[in-house]
UniProtKB/Swiss-Prot annotation:
InterPro entries to which the protein is assigned, alphabetical: FAD-bd_PCMH, FAD-bd_PCMH-like_sf, FAD-bd_PCMH_sub2, FAD-linked_Oxidoreductase, Oxid_FAD_bind_N
Keyword Flavoprotein appears in the UniProt entry: yes
Keyword Oxidoreductase among record annotations: yes
Organismal lineage: Eukaryota, Fungi, Dikarya, Ascomycota, Pezizomycotina
Gene (UniProt): CTB5
Protein function: FAD-dependent monooxygenase; part of the gene cluster that mediates the biosynthesis of cercosporin, a light-activated, non-host-selective toxin. The perylenequinone chromophore of cercosporin absorbs light energy to attain an electronically-activated triplet state and produces active oxygen species such as the hydroxyl radical, superoxide, hydrogen peroxide or singlet oxygen upon reaction with oxygen molecules. These reactive oxygen species cause damage to various cellular components including lipids, proteins and nucleic acids.
Pathway annotation from the record: Mycotoxin biosynthesis
Organism the protein comes from: Cercospora nicotianae (Barn spot disease fungus)
SUPFAM superfamilies linked to this entry: FAD-binding/transporter-associated domain-like (SSF56176)
EC number: 1.-.-.-
Domain FAD-binding PCMH-type: 10-187
Protein name: FAD-dependent monooxygenase CTB5
Length: 459
């Protein structure tokens, strides 16, 4: 259990962990568990683990039930024409990139190495290439799925198309995905890296960020995250992620990032670099970003969104600082506050077929990926920290609404258990998802027996 990204999952004690090595073995397990629940109502609870990165307790585990760990599921690999790649849900994105980089190809995947394909592809993960191509789920050409009956089916644009659409953003509500086939596209090395700054420069970053996030049209090659880190003891620093994904040839220091590069850079510690800017491949960038993340620790994610506004970025920073000061001396404490632009071109997703529905239509968005971590020894602070974050987000949303800059959107891969992504989707989208769930899972096994993840609303 200590292999999960967040040690909150170690609080749960499954009765058994199964490690299937094929879709057929997953099928046997699901059929047995489904029959058991039919005979003993409320029993035979199970969790499904792909990469095990979702941090909240029970997302991919269960207490006194069964965990189906997909760690040993096989991957078919890249197709002969290099147009697709088929991998298991437990494959981490950096391994996918490593295969594709060798052929100057890529796909949409997470920006951080070590995260499994399954969760990010069935939800609404964001990529370095999302302004050009949309969300990770929109790259899935085919799902191999084990249904509650134990049947193994393919879901794609021509076969079980409604299930294909539902799984593109519908999370774990329809079956167990045992293989994911992703579209690949031409992509060579590109320019990017991290830049480090003192916290006193933050308002320069906020102004540049708001200008970039408000841009119409948005440069689809521009990827940027403004990251502010509150470290143990109360020291803040800034470590931004900048990528310009145009390749063949790559463009160093493109015009869109010139204002950002004028801000004074400062190493986090003496002897460290002030930036890591270079031309490199996506495998390298993802592993660099992952190296900044300590685990195993206890982690909490959350997400909040608003219109691009430099003043509100400062307001939220001050509110976050005030809310977390009481915890900064906890062993291992760290707050990572990521401001990320979500331009209209990304939200519209090139008209992709998925189950996200119409995402808010009020223009470009800035969303916050909130991540707090601390050592396992401080587990007694879980509830207090969660309550502090909930109070902070409620106050921030209230303030944003007063200013007319609230945006009804959260990024599902960054949401905590109290933030259901389905609350942010349209009524018609939810009705379609529920209908698909009842069609492929008439006994609602994945609603009743699999408590982890985000369940569909009852309508």
């Amino acid at each position: 259990m200590g292999s999960y990204f967040s040690l909150k999952n170690s609080d749960l004690h499954p009765s058994c962990i199964a490690l299937p090595r094929s879709a057929e073995e997953v099928s046997k397990a699901v059929r047995t568990l489904s029959l058991g629940a039919h005979k003993w109502e409320g029993q035979c609870q199970f969790g499904v683990r792909g990469g095990g990165h979702t941090p909240f307790k029970g997302a991919a585990s269960t207490d006194n039930g069964i965990v189906l760990d997909l760690l040993h599921m096989p991957s078919a690999g890249i197709s002969p024409d290099y147009e697709t790649i088929t991998v298991s849900p437990s494959t981490t994105w950096d391994l996918v990139y490593e295969v594709l980089d060798a052929h100057n190809r890529s796909t949409l995947g997470t920006k951080v190495a070590g995260i499994g394909v399954g969760g990010a592809s069935t939800s609404c993960g964001v990529s370095y290439f999302s302004p050009r191509y949309g969300y990770i789920c929109d790259m899935v050409e085919n799902w191999e799925v084990v249904l509650a009956t134990g049947d193994i089916v393919n879901a794609n644009a021509n076969e079980n198309a409604d299930l294909w659409k539902a799984l593109r953003g519908g999370i774990n509500n329809f079956g167990i995905v045992t293989a994911v086939t992703l579209k690949a596209f031409e992509q060579g090395p590109f320019w990017g890296g991290q830049t480090f700054h003192s916290i006193e420069t933050r308002q320069e970053h906020f102004k540049n960020h708001a200008k970039l996030a408000s841009a119409h049209p948005y440069d689809p090659y521009a990827h940027y995250i403004n990251t502010l880190v509150l470290a143990n003891g109360g020291h803040w620093f800034i470590g931004n992620s900048i990528q310009y994904t145009k390749s063949d040839p790559p463009v160093a220091e493109p015009e869109v990032f010139k204002p950002f590069l004028k801000t004074e850079r400062t190493p986090i510690f003496p002897g460290l670099p002030e930036d890591t800017l270079r031309v490199d491949n996506v495998t390298s960038f993802s592993r660099e970003y992952a190296a900044n993340t300590l685990y195993p620790q206890r982690w909490q994610f959350a997400c909040i969104s608003f219109a691009p506004d430099a003043d509100f970025m400062e307001t939220f920073f001050q509110m976050a600082n005030d809310a977390m000061q009481q915890y900064v001396k906890l062993p291992g404490f760290k707050l990572i506050l990521n401001y990320q632009p979500a331009p209209t071109v990304q939200l519209e997703r090139n008209g992709a077929v998925d189950s996200l529905g119409p995402i808010q239509t009020e223009g470009n968005v800035v969303f916050v990926h909130w991540a707090v971590s601390y050592d396992e020894s401080e587990a007694q602070f879980d509830d207090a920290i969660t309550k502090s974050v909930q109070d902070l987000f409620h106050a921030a949303n209230t303030k944003a609404k007063e200013l007319g800059i609230y945006r009804h959107f959260i990024q599902p891969t960054y949401a905590d258990s109290w933030q259901s992504p389905f609350d942010y989707r349209s009524k018609s989208t939810i009705e379609e998802l529920v209908a698909t769930s009842k069609k492929y899972d008439p006994l609602q096994v994945f609603q009743k027996q699999v408590p982890g993840g985000f369940k569909l609303p009852q309508i």
